[in-house]
């Protein structure tokens, strides 16, 4: 572990009695907290937001904040400050969130509403060019012919940050499980940057801050390249990353070899967390210092997993990238 942040649970938040939800360290790491909305909170929230279908949230963006306020009010206005504090805390920065009573694909619209409410208590979800909305839903099946590893089930999707090929700052990533059938394997993989054994050697390398070209495949619906380094710093000078192996375009031998070594060093880390995410639950992580990926699935002809993602910016004091945004 690096000296940047020790793994130390925020005992004040964990010991506090919360209204409408429970909070505890996850089974995988004290950096990852498990937040669960009570059955009563879930029931009241869904009742109060039933008047707005997801289409209304798509068309009227202010409603996303409205339903966030409804959820926070049901939690005694304790939810929003806790979410912000946790996600901005370098020693944590990650939550596994669930709601009692939401656990079936038939509740897909309710899942989108809940995730939207939570995300818009911390900031705003960016436009997703792949879907044309502020969120994207996509399916992983046993056979895939797409142009990236996003939907390919029988290989590991390597650790990466989101937002590497867009201009918008991507502070957070939300990943929700909507459906799962005939599934074995496929856990989410997480690595906190400060737990990466090779951070210092790569962050101090001459290529760490070199501006590189990033280009997305056609399925992402992004027509122009962006330019930024792999590493940057936050407002306190701590390392942050914007990296994905599929979309970085090394210009020469030196960059290509270094990026290959970087990829190998990430994938062989002994501190990668393997996190099962059941239907109805979602991960919410700080994208600046957490990398995420997905383990491989066991093949099955009727394999199906549906996911929903949102990614966006913090609307409150945050450690944005200092350069090359």
UniProtKB/Swiss-Prot annotation:
One family name in Pfam for this protein: CsiD
Residues that, per the record, bind Fe cation: 160, 162, 292
Q: Which CDD domains match?
A: CAS_like (cd00250)
Question: Which InterPro entries did the record assign?
Answer: GlaH, TauD-like_sf
Give the cofactor note: Binds 1 Fe(2+) ion per subunit.
Tell me the function of this protein. Acts as an alpha-ketoglutarate-dependent dioxygenase catalyzing hydroxylation of glutarate (GA) to L-2-hydroxyglutarate (L2HG). Functions in a L-lysine degradation pathway that proceeds via cadaverine, glutarate and L-2-hydroxyglutarate.
On assembly, the entry states: Homotetramer.
Query: What's this protein's family per the entry?
Result: Belongs to the glutarate hydroxylase family.
According to UniProt, the name of this protein is Glutarate 2-hydroxylase
What is the source species? Salmonella typhimurium (strain LT2 / SGSC1412 / ATCC 700720)
Q: Which gene encodes it?
A: glaH
């Amino acid at each position: 572990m690096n000296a940047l942040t020790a793994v130390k649970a925020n005992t004040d938040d964990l010991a506090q009695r919360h209204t409408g939800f429970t909070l505890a360290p996850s089974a995988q790491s004290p950096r990852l907290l498990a937040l669960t909305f009570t059955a009563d909170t879930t029931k009241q929230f869904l009742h109060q937001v039933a008047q707005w279908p997801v289409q209304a949230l798509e068309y009227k963006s202010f409603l996303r904040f409205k339903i966030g306020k409804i959820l926070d009010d049901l939690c005694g206005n304790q939810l929003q400050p806790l979410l912000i504090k946790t996600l901005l805390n370098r020693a944590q920065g990650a939550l596994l969130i669930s709601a009692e009573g939401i656990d079936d694909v038939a509740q897909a619209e309710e899942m989108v509403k809940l995730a939207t409410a939570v995300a818009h208590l911390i900031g705003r979800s960016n436009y997703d060019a792949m879907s044309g909305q502020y969120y994207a839903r996509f399916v992983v099946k046993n056979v895939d012919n797409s142009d990236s590893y996003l939907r390919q089930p029988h290989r590991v999707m390597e650790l990466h940050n989101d937002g590497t090929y867009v201009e918008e700052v991507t502070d957070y990533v939300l990943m929700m499980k909507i459906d799962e059938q005939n599934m074995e394997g496929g856990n989410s993989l997480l690595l906190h940057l400060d737990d990466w054994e090779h951070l210092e050697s790569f962050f101090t390398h001459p290529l760490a801050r070199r501006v590189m070209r990033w280009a997305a495949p056609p399925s992402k619906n992004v027509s122009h390249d962006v330019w930024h380094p792999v590493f940057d710093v936050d407002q306190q000078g701590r390392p942050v990353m914007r990296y994905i192996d599929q979309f970085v375009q090394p210009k020469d031998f030196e960059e290509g070899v270094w990026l290959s070594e970087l990829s190998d060093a990430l994938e062989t880390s002994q501190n990668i967390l393997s996190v099962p995410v059941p239907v109805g639950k979602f991960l919410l992580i700080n994208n600046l210092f957490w990398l995420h990926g997905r383990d491989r699935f066991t093949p099955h002809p009727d394999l199906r997993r549906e996911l929903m993602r949102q990614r966006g910016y913090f609307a409150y004091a945050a450690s944005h990238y200092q350069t090359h945004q």
